[in-house]
């Protein structure tokens, strides 16, 4: 006991002997250390321990529908499958009627739910097509909307070298399609006082990506759109999330092999649906209504937040894309010579 009192006296004497600015810096350092500990624990709990909002809140197993765009391949198909498994009827929206029918049949057979399909090419969708989609949606009790359809550049390129039709398609698919489909479904969600809107975003929307400027800009739109819309409809019991995503094995990413940072669609989608309402890795990023739920993506997002030097990541991404473009052009040259 005496030794503890002596230690306390020594500490108090040391503090009294220090100038005021030293005490201030010590207090500031202690505060920052506690803040980082608190934030880290919060991210870990949200990512690995706490459950998200139950899908039953949005009508699972109660006859409600889930609408998924880009629903016949990769992440979109996996969302459709897992939402069907959760007890939602599923409306699949994509380009190819044959793959739509096959995916719908697979969901019906496996999960004994209703399905519907709507074929639309969002890159060239007319007003008549959007009107027809609205008519299909009329009368459906939509509890979940997954704005998954997306398009990136064929390869990294500077804006001056990017084909105009590629830029147009990226904006039409990533921005306009999200706006139009959300606009068609939202009134029903507001009326029913419940709903979940998942906008599948990208790290490219959080960190500007040179040589993918158009794509990066459209994903930044999803982030701000989700933040604004989420605040608007919070009073109506609707959750809007920009799902911040690093790479996932898919045709869009052109990645075929999984790794710690690059999951296949199944575990990625499970993480999204199990963490609804939790920001996970984006908890302290300053991006409201954004979630980074897949565990390795969450840790990466949080680490980038702690570093807090966007210019560093922008330069890294620029150099990475220069290398990717160089390798892609070499591959095209080899293929041309082989013909």
From Swiss-Prot:
Keywords: Endoplasmic reticulum, Fatty acid biosynthesis, Fatty acid metabolism, Lipid biosynthesis, Lipid metabolism, Membrane, NADP, Oxidoreductase, Transmembrane, Transmembrane helix. NADP(+) binds at residues 67, 96, 121, 148, 215, 219, 248, 250. It is a single-pass membrane protein. Pathway: Lipid metabolism; fatty acid biosynthesis. GO terms for cellular component: endoplasmic reticulum membrane. The chain crosses the membrane at residues 21-41. GO terms for biological process: fatty acid elongation. It is found in: Endoplasmic reticulum membrane. Its EC number is 1.1.1.330. It comes from the Eukaryota. SUPFAM superfamilies: NAD(P)-binding Rossmann-fold domains. InterPro entries: 3_ketoreductase_fungal, NAD(P)-bd_dom_sf, Sc_DH/Rdtase_CS, SDR_fam. GO terms for molecular function: ketoreductase activity; very-long-chain 3-oxoacyl-CoA reductase activity. It catalyses: a very-long-chain (3R)-3-hydroxyacyl-CoA + NADP(+) = a very-long-chain 3-oxoacyl-CoA + NADPH + H(+). Belongs to the short-chain dehydrogenases/reductases (SDR) family. Component of the microsomal membrane bound fatty acid elongation system, which produces the 26-carbon very long-chain fatty acids (VLCFA) from palmitate. Catalyzes the reduction of the 3-ketoacyl-CoA intermediate that is formed in each cycle of fatty acid elongation. VLCFAs serve as precursors for ceramide and sphingolipids. This is Very-long-chain 3-oxoacyl-CoA reductase. It comes from Coprinopsis cinerea (strain Okayama-7 / 130 / ATCC MYA-4618 / FGSC 9003).
